Regions:
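Interfacial loop-to-transmembrane junctions
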Residues: 255-284
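Hydrophobic alpha-helical transmembrane segments in multi-pass integral membrane proteins
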Residues: 158-168, 226-233, 281-297
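Intramembrane alpha-helical segments
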Residues: 93, 97-164
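Transmembrane alpha-helical segments that form the membrane-embedded catalytic/substrate-channel core
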Residues: 58-66, 129-135, 177-195, 227, ...
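Cytosolic, membrane-interface loops and tails of multi-pass inner-membrane proteins
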Residues: 2-13, 70-91, 188-216
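Membrane-embedded alpha-helical segments that form the functional core of polytopic membrane enzymes
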Residues: 32-34, 38-72, 80, 121-132, ...
């Protein structure tokens, strides 16, 4: 009896599986890049921020759930994904699809009802881009999957800006491109570490197609472009000293980490450090924008 109870407690619950489908760790960063632009644009009320957090989680969670539905065949072949709800047999594929669509539908209604139609449309566009353009098409066909598909993760700043201003201007587009150029080196660091897994699933990630050295060189170039892009608005007076110092320090640390990956013979630890720090980098960069605008401005 005791053994049965212990076994039941050790097995994932339905609630835990539903949360797993949404990929909450990934969503937390997306929410930072959604909310921060709102504070750069003005002073959003707590209710609007709450709506954006809830709606953003629902939309991104829905996209992630549908992603797991579409990737159920390759998830069974990869060690890091085979324990997900569908490949492990804990949930039916159709139930996961219905769950994902329901979350996205709820998010669309929430945005349209309590913000504006543009916000809902942009959020839904990000959903469709991630699900169909990236997951269904690019991921399985080209090593440029992350380069082009990275646009999906760059929609949240547009959504946050539109919720606050009702428009998408050059500032919002600038935020979009920061995330866009940040994405490839971030995911290529993971691809270097998990390339055998991707190989088993026949996913043409950059290290498998271009080779490790070329992937590392591409990571350096993308980081150089990213640094140049992050400091650009300072020359136009959009941000001040606080943001400039943050962008240079954070960008310098990230670039140094990527260069270190290319210099050491065993780059496993260095690649992990780049992958983890890149997450912190993006969050801190967007926070620095807010601090600069509210304190320095």
């Amino acid at each position: 009896m005791m053994g049965t109870v212990a076994e039941e407690r050790s097995q994932p619950s339905l609630v835990r599986d539903l949360v797993m489908l949404t990929k909450p760790r990934i969503i937390s960063l997306l929410l930072v890049t959604t909310v921060a632009p709102m504070f750069v644009a003005g002073n959003p009320g707590w209710l609007l921020v709450l709506i954006m957090i809830i709606g953003g989680y629902l939309m991104a969670g829905g996209a992630n759930a549908v992603n797991m539905y579409l990737d159920r065949d390759i998830d069974t072949r990869m060690s890091r994904t085979r324990l997900r709800p569908i490949p492990s047999g804990r949930m039916e594929a159709r139930a996961v699809l219905a769950f994902g669509v329901a979350l996205a539908t709820a998010a669309t209604f929430l945005f349209a009802r309590f913000t504006n139609v543009l916000t809902a449309a942009l959020a839904l566009a990000g959903f469709y881009f991630y699900v169909f353009v990236y997951t269904r098409w690019l991921k399985r066909t080209t090593p440029h999957n992350i380069v082009i598909g990275g646009a999906a993760g760059a929609f949240p700043p547009l959504v946050g800006w539109a919720a606050m201003t009702g428009t998408v201007d050059l500032t919002a587009v600038y935020f979009f491109f920061i995330v866009f150029y940040w994405t490839p080196p971030h995911f290529w660091a993971l691809a270097l570490l998990k390339q055998r897994d991707y190989g088993k699933a026949a996913i043409p990630m950059a290290p498998l197609v271009w080779g490790e050295r070329e992937t590392m060189r591409q990571m350096i170039w993308y980081n150089v472009i990213l640094i140049a892009l992050t400091v650009l608005p300072v020359s136009f007076g959009a941000f001040g000293t606080i943001y400039l110092a943050s962008a240079l320090v954070l960008g310098g640390i990230l670039l140094a980490g990527v260069i270190r990956v290319t210099l050491v013979s065993d780059w496993t630890r260095a690649a992990w450090q780049v992958y983890k720090f890149s997450l912190l980098y993006l969050a801190l960069l967007f926070v620095a924008m807010v601090v600069d605008r509210k304190v320095g401005g």
